[in-house]
Regions:
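Carboxylate-rich, polar loop motifs that coordinate divalent cations or form catalytic acidic clusters
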Residues: 2-634
Length: 634
């Protein structure tokens, strides 16, 4: 499909929505204000306003594919957002600006909308983020509305109102309202909801949830609709309001409401990811069926697919620009051409990485960075990081660990479907599974030793050497069968498991440690790093604990709050120890000062899943991309 530029009239972009000032709207507006003020005195949510300075981070991202989730027109440009950040396109389809999650924005955007907040005096682009609250952009600068409580920072929806208030949907805390000065819960009926979408206005507000159907607010009254009231599914994906009608999209079709009352189900069985009312029809963006058009006639509507070809992937958003229908997928923007067929008008551009969700990192002797993905195989990046060779097949798809063996100059990929060995040229040479002697085909870690290697699996560990394969599990004294992490030094081997740590000497279990007989706070051992004559042991929920060769455990006094260390996301260098966490970024232990601190600013995600080092540079993989930074700037 040929990529084309797109043009749209400035009048269509800059037209301001007319503001109704009748009695009904005034009454509804006062109801919204009253609902907010009733909770403001005793339920105000503390927050800070931060003025962002994009581009000041010293963390450098490696080009990853853009993924689109939402789009909106603002000040003559089209803005597309997704996990990678916010991209501004001009009317010719050229990129005018990129604001990347991490270096420029504090978190990944999830939704965008335009409006004017009370006190701002000008239209703004509002960006709801996953974990860092609300961003407001006036075309020149960003301000960051950041609640102190992390639960209120995890946003899922944003809806600016004509009154100057901005409604925010959260993942766990329901709906809150920001008026430029205060942040408060919207209404008691909307607290603690898992909000998925917001639509409507002061007089007619619809709130979709993840599992509890849809709530309708009308002039101060609230009504909930679930499956018993006609909704085809309690999981609400999308909502569009048109006059007195509302359409609520679910994975099993669209519920039509008229005057606040359920009327009928449209497009039954269709996964309604996005909705748009246009020219007397309901356009439904689906998961795998492209765009389905449903005529809105009194007779029973018959859905029909839009365009001669189905759009690839999920349709995230539908837009009408200059009377033409546009569909946003995760990797492109399409529109219906004059001939009725879909044409691509924007693409996500070139990228080095095949995916954003990184699970493992390792360097080989040639300085190439092996990058594993959770479900996309692996890339072998050139030392310049400007190109990559992608490998993905039945065995190389879900990468748990990558390890380079200096002695043999081979790289091992521990995957969900075996241990795959590659030669120095990056060619696949051998696949080891249960049929080849492993105790299980799913491999979680691998450690090379002088005479062979040790393979960790959910069923125990397997030793491979010149004598063949032999396995060890709970029957032989292993503290737990499910092994996650390995670390070897001489004849000593540490095996981190779901149930504690086993210490082996000469392949025999010498000691087991759990919360019952050691300083461990959690039994689940996720990562182990050799630091001098000691070991730093990462746990899932208990942070990092020090373990010495005599079997003594000691906690770090400056690591008081518990945290989750991701599986095998630990790295020790001459100067520091790095631990990738689930929510807190990178925990950094300075070996000179013996103190910990955290590194989060500039990361594309606080979920750090893999770490590697080379030439004084640290490489950090996350579930939203890869960055690098000089170790001396840690």
């Amino acid at each position: 499909m040929r990529t084309r530029t797109f043009r749209f009239a400035c009048a269509g972009l800059l037209a301001a929505a007319a503001v109704a000032i009748g009695f009904a709207l005034l009454r509804a507006s006062r109801a919204v204000q009253r609902a907010s003020s009733e909770t403001a005195a005793d339920a105000a949510i503390p927050f800070r306003v931060i003025h962002l300075d994009p581009g000041r981070s010293n963390l450098e991202p490696v080009a990853a594919p853009a993924v689109f989730r939402d789009a909106v027109l603002f000040q003559g440009s089209l803005y597309l957002c997704g996990p990678g950040g916010l991209i501004q396109y001009d009317s010719e389809g050229a990129v005018r600006a990129r604001f990347m999650a991490g270096p420029d924005l504090p978190a990944a955007p999830v939704r965008v909308a335009t409006g004017a907040a009370a006190g701002s005096g000008e239209p703004e682009l509002f960006v709801a983020t996953a974990g860092e609250g609300l961003l407001a952009y006036n075309g020149r600068a960003f301000r960051h509305v950041r609640p102190n409580d992390a639960a209120y920072r995890d946003l899922t929806a944003v809806l600016p109102l004509a009154t100057g208030r901005v409604l925010l949907g959260t993942a766990k805390k329901g709906v809150v309202v920001y008026d430029g000065e205060r942040l408060v819960p919207f209404h008691a009926a909307f607290e603690n909801l898992e909000v998925s979408v917001l639509a409507g206005d002061d007089a007619n507000l619809w709130t979709g949830t993840v599992n509890d159907g849809v709530l309708h607010w009308r002039a101060g009254a609230v009504e909930r609709f679930g499956e018993a009231e006609g909704l085809p599914d309690p999981h609400v994906l999308s909502i569009v309001v048109s006059g007195d009608a509302a359409y609520v999209g679910t994975p099993m079709g669209v519920a039509e409401f008229a005057g606040g009352r359920f009327r009928r189900v449209l497009a039954e069985g269709v996964f309604a990811e996005s909705l748009l009312v246009r020219d007397g029809a309901l356009e439904v963006g689906t998961l795998e069926q492209g765009v389905v058009e449903v005529p809105l006639t009194p007779a029973r509507p018959r859905p029909a697919s839009r365009g001669a070809e189905l759009l690839p992937g999920k349709v995230e958003r539908l837009l009408a620009i200059d009377a033409r229908l546009y569909a946003l997928s995760e990797n492109s923007l399409y529109r219906i051409g004059r001939d009725g067929a879909w044409e691509r008008v924007l693409d996500r551009g070139a990228a080095v990485l095949a995916d954003r969700n990184i699970s493992a990192l390792a360097f080989d002797s040639a300085g190439r960075l092996w990058t594993g993905y959770f479900d996309r195989g692996l890339d072998i990046l050139a030392p310049t990081l400007d190109r990559a060779t992608h490998i993905e097949n039945d065995h190389v798809f879900c990468i748990n660990r990558l390890v380079w063996d200096r002695e043999r100059n081979v790289t091992a990929a521990a995957t969900a479907n075996g241990l795959v060995l590659f030669d120095a040229a990056g060619r696949e040479r051998q696949v080891l599974r249960r049929e080849q002697g492993l105790i299980a085909s799913q491999v979680t870690d691998v450690a090379f030793r002088g005479g062979g290697m040790v393979v960790a699996t959910p069923a125990g560990v397997t030793f491979l050497d010149g004598a063949g394969a032999r396995s060890l599990y709970a029957f032989h004294g292993l503290v737990n069968n499910h092994a996650y992490a390995l670390a070897a030094a001489g004849e000593r081997l540490l095996v981190g498991t779901l149930g504690g740590l086993s210490v082996l000497d000469n392949d025999t279990v010498r000691a087991n440690y759990t919360t019952a007989n050691s300083g461990l706070r959690h039994n689940w051992i996720t990562a182990i790093a050799r630091v001098g004559d000691e070991w730093f042991v990462g746990t899932y929920g208990g942070g990092v604990i020090r373990f010495d060769s005599s079997g003594r455990w000691s906690r770090f006094p400056d690591l008081r709050a518990p945290f989750e260390v991701n599986t095998n996301a630990m790295l020790a260098t001459e100067h520091a120890v790095y631990a990738g966490s689930l929510r807190g970024g990178i925990y950094v232990y300075d070996r000179a000062s013996a103190r910990w601190h955290t590194l989060r600013a500039g990361l594309p995600s606080p979920n750090v899943t893999a770490l590697a080092a080379r030439g004084g540079t640290i490489y950090a993989g996350t579930d939203n991309g890869l960055v690098r930074f000089p170790e001396d700037s840690r």
